[in-house]
Amino acid sequence: MALVDENGKIINKEIVNYEDEKSEKFILEKINEYVARNSQGVNAIGIGVPGIIKNNKIIYTCNISLVDSYFIRKIRTKIPVYLANDALCATLAEYQLIDNCKYDNYALMTIGTGIGAGLIFNKQVYEGRSGYAGEVGHMVIRKNGLQCNCGRRGCFEKYASVSRLLQIAKVNTLKEFFNLVESNKYVASIFNYYLDDLAEGMANFIMVNDVDMLVIGGSLAWFGDKFYYILRAKIAEKLFNREAKDVKMKFAKLGNDAGLIGAAFLSEWLNQKNKED
């Protein structure tokens, strides 16, 4: 949680460990406590949620128990509250602060505990008719594959999330994993197969969305310099035309703060979108 000014500068930030407690009650309690301490002079509150959001309502979440159409009514404040997918929040921060809104069509794919994406088409936020746009983590890449928390089988994030990579390699952190890649042939082979699956999903995403710039975010982006060219080559192998193969692609710059900063921008972007609609 953070207090952010209109320029995207973080004034203060608090980190809450919710790994062992992901209930709505706990999350609301922490939000309300933070709002009570930091609401003076605040014009809007933005919240990023790892799930499907439509019209400021939580439609579905996969990895936390937070399905509540009236969630924002339980936040004790008179300040306007805006909800959006957490990947979309990160997208807005990178698009506005790093890329200065210069691309017409833009996407950021977050690769961490799960996989999600935020989309900007014609310089406008795109959530889709029902809020499902960007739910790339639940795109099936293996028919009858691994069971996903969403109820489907073979979902992209079951093969290409950071959680899956660490699980297969039997390590706790990406830092530990990449320390082993160069010296351990078994771990190197795991990473090669992992990049195949990551490239599969990313190639599908590129073909469907045809954006001007694709940014890779999430914890995997911190180590991007170790595999960027290998990943690009694997993606190119799965695409059939030159234009798709030449898509601009890079790693996010804002790290863990991207979602916080982007959430602070939600009121501006969503109000603009509503005016256009």
PLM region spans:
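Short, well-ordered beta-strand segments
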Residues: 2, 46-48, 215-217
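Glycine-rich phosphate-binding loop and adjoining helix at the ATP-binding site
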Residues: 19-32, 36, 41-45, 51-105, ...
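Hydrophobic "anchor" residues
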Residues: 10, 53, 58, 125-126
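Glycine-rich phosphate-binding/hydrolytic loop that grips phosphoryl groups
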Residues: 4, 85-96, 222-277
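Short glycine-rich anion-binding loops that position phosphate/pyrophosphate groups of nucleotides
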Residues: 50-52, 112-114, 220
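Adenine-nucleotide phosphate-binding core of ATP-dependent small-molecule kinases
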Residues: 14-42, 156-158, 164-232, 247-252, ...
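Glycine/GP-enriched mid-protein hinge/lid loop-to-helix segment characteristic of carbohydrate kinases
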Residues: 2-8, 14-15, 23-24, 80-82, ...
